Amino acid sequence: MPKRTDIKSILILGAGPIVIGQACEFDYSGAQACKALREEGYRVILVNSNPATIMTDPAMADATYIEPIKWQTVAKIIEKERPDALLPTMGGQTALNCALDLEREGVLEKFGVEMIGANADTIDKAEDRSRFDKAMKSIGLACPRSGIAHSMEEANAVLEKLGFPCIIRPSFTMGGTGGGIAYNREEFEEICARGLDLSPTKELLIDESLIGWKEYEMEVVRDKKDNCIIVCSIENFDPMGVHTGDSITVAPAQTLTDKEYQILRNASLAVLREIGVETGGSNVQFGICPDTGRMVVIEMNPRVSRSSALASKATGFPIARVAAKLAVGYTLDELSNEITGGKTPASFEPSIDYVVTKLPRFAFEKFAKADARLTTQMKSVGEVMAIGRTFQESLQKALRGLEVGVCGLDPKLDLSHPESMSTLKRELTVPGAERIWYVADAFRAGMTVEEIFAMNMIDPWFLVQIEDLVKDEEKIKTLGLSAIDRDLMYRLKRKGFSDARLAKLVGVTEKNLRTHRHKLDVFPVYKRVDTCAAEFATDTAYLYSTYEEECEANPSTRDKIMILGGGPNRIGQGIEFDYCCVHAALALREDGYETIMVNCNPETVSTDYDTSDRLYFEPVTLEDVLEIVRVEKPKGVIVQYGGQTPLKLARALEAAGVPIIGTSPDAIDRAEDRERFQQMVERLNLRQPPNATVRSEDEAIRAAAKIGYPLVVRPSYVLGGRAMEIVYQEDELKRYLREAVQVSNDSPVLLDHFLNCAIEMDVDAVCDGTDVVIGAIMQHIEQAGVHSGDSACSLPPYSLPAHIQDEMREQVKKMALELGVVGLMNVQLALQGEDIYVIEVNPRASRTVPFVSKCIGVSLAMIAARVMAGKTLKELNFTKEIIPNFYSVKEAVFPFAKFPGVDPILGPEMKSTGEVMGVGDTFGEAFAKAQMGASEVLPTGGTAFISVRDDDKPLVEAVARDLINLGFEIVATAGTAKLIEAAGLKVRRVNKVTEGRPHVVDMIKNDEVTLIINTTEGRQSIADSYSIRRNALQHKIYCTTTIAAGEAICEALKFGPEKTVRRLQDLHAGLKA
């Protein structure tokens, strides 16, 4: 069946902001779907609230709406655009839930919109646990024994039937949000209460425990003629009980016999047929009991998922692209496989001659109070994938690509320590983020495969592989460097050992080891990912390294530029940097360069095989980058686009003779090194908060007295504000130094005077060495002290006088020219009274670049990439700042709901995982829409609770007056209430938590409060008011921890509920007029 001609326009729903469980894999699938459908001549309309995505670029769709993905908003877009069809399978759980809402509210029927890719019944049958259970029984497949509950009474009835331990999962939530494993009644009641609260349908599925079972996934694609292919089988290294997003996974499955594989294969096809997936990809998850071989179906997702992004990158088969074409009527045999240049049809199952390993990346160091144990609720924030010819090689490559300070199976424990064995037993039994390293330590401690298997049920095949690597390490330790001959070196490199790990074992520097390896003539070769195990020749350069005979890299002699990506997502370094890398590749390709991308993150658009001319799916480490440079000999390498990851390599690459283009590593160092930076600030007569760099406790206390409290303290060279704190007195400083000196490994600690109540600004600029153009000035809504990645910001600024803005422009230009920036630069400034302070300068791409580009209609990342390659801003015709005639607000999105026990207060350490954008004619409208996009429900009336620190008291009267005019009643704690009364306003007093009951938390628990403004100062007051914020989060009450955000909310509420939807393309056209 060729494509349908009865539909002309298709609406695609995106996934919204990046949250744990739903990351940039949906940008990758959505971008592919847009491309695939436009190629076929359809008009594509896209809705996504996340400005940091490639899919929201104005060139990706015919009409782009950066608007909240809520059915009310989408209904307005449908009314305006009148699409014929809606494709809901590309935007994760967010898009599916929104599509079901549109169906239920009658919007699709009213405007005659057909759902394609999956219909409402299919989605419901797969997502609704009881319907799914019945469907599986009808085709003779078992599901775990389970029951469904809509209340605590029903939950207890199910428990009687199943017993402990049991697994609890809320319906229609994603990444296992709200679920968990209960071993006793107390835990059971706590998890059920949380789950009922978080499930949009107030429904729980309670399963028998399958903990310790083996877990497998099948990625299946099916068309409407019932052609089915298995793209890839995936095996979880961690047994059941750990969410698949937090498991180490391996593709293809390693421990299945051929017969077992065929059984799973047939079962997964039967599942798709029964559920009715006719057009596109699904993943089906199975559990198998290692003792009895009993098989159960755990779940299926009738959409493109995290696993399908992994399967696409692992095999080279573009699932999302194919799924989009199937949704408009094609069948698999009609589509050709792009990777083999059309030599094979899409109905050929990929076959692979290598092993892929995915490791999750966690961010527990950001959330001190979080429970770091892995359960059925997803907690990882990113992932890394590696390709090798054996499991050992791909595992070791993934370990070093993770960027957690290891270069392989580094030891975690000092085994001579008396406590070490009990720590080891605990870490092996209860899964945590570092279990694989403890498994290696267990072998070092002399434990056997059987003993370890008995503790954690990890398949013995995997354990034997790790044991073998540990044996090799023990052997190398006894040798000197000269004793490693060519044969041994070759054997070790084939097993994936990094130069850095071998150097550590032998006791030499990494550089010495590399020189020795090169002398022995041991170099990697590069193989291609081609979907057909090299059966057909392929022109697609999607490459990975291994140590074998034949090299398939086949480099050209064209002018090449290499872009280093950002590695795995983490808090502080996410999709924004990937966006910049993609834009650099697109711009330089257009200009005739051959572009080479190096990255190891399977979720992103940068690792799509057609983003750049050549893709090396490799860890972004010194060794791996140098080997690629040796083969490709690029004319230039870009390090300023991938966040901190490539920047850390800049000096070493430069020393090895790699041509780094753009801002020089020395200039980057001048901005990052405090003492050199200070000299520059003084030379330009600019202001900086008084500061000092200290190397001991005594020195710190003396310096603090001179600078004056409060202080911002932090280790030098960090991204995302890791281990930053604000201290208000000497005992707090002493406590910080005791805890933080470990963070800084003898590197100094920085003290800055904290600018209390200052307004912060972010400025992005592009410089070509002679001219500087300001991209935008953004005003932060939260005042200084909140990390810039966590603060909401407004473009253009909503309350900065023009003369201050002009002064800031001048300062930024001076610094750019002084540093000799070539490319992008970001400056953070603070305004206290009339004084402008320079907080920091980053001569690289910053996380605001995508947001700014969407606001001003110009891609800064593309312009800066061309500047790095030698063009001037005049040649590029970008010579003056574009100031939009509308307001845009960027708001951060946080993962606090996933981490019970963590305080949802904002501070100098970054905690957000993603962002949304709201656009409006006024600041209030834009702010209101950004809140909506971040799934924050703004109250329209009720009772507002206010309690603020002394510094904020002068501002409280205006906020209280606004709220009363908007119809709120005010309650406040004694000190704040006194001020509000003094202004002649009506207020009710309420006790602080420390003052006895009934207190404010009682009011929150009784749902008597609808809005909370709670600001704090110092460690004690933060601790005292913790329960206010945590309860507000659990009861979904809008809570802000800064007075400035309180003022912004009043603006948003004045705007009211009526919001207009705006096409990005129209906004940009208005700027050019």
From Swiss-Prot:
Residues where Mn(2+) 3 binds: Q828, E840
Annotated binding of Mn(2+) 4, by residue: E840, N842
Stretch list, region Allosteric domain: 936-1073
Catalytic activity line of the entry: hydrogencarbonate + L-glutamine + 2 ATP + H2O = carbamoyl phosphate + L-glutamate + 2 ADP + phosphate + 2 H(+)
GO molecular function, one term: ATP binding
Quaternary state and interactors: Composed of two chains; the small (or glutamine) chain promotes the hydrolysis of glutamine to ammonia, which is used by the large (or ammonia) chain to synthesize carbamoyl phosphate. Tetramer of heterodimers (alpha,beta)4.
Name of the protein: Carbamoyl phosphate synthase large chain
Gene transcribed to yield this protein: carB
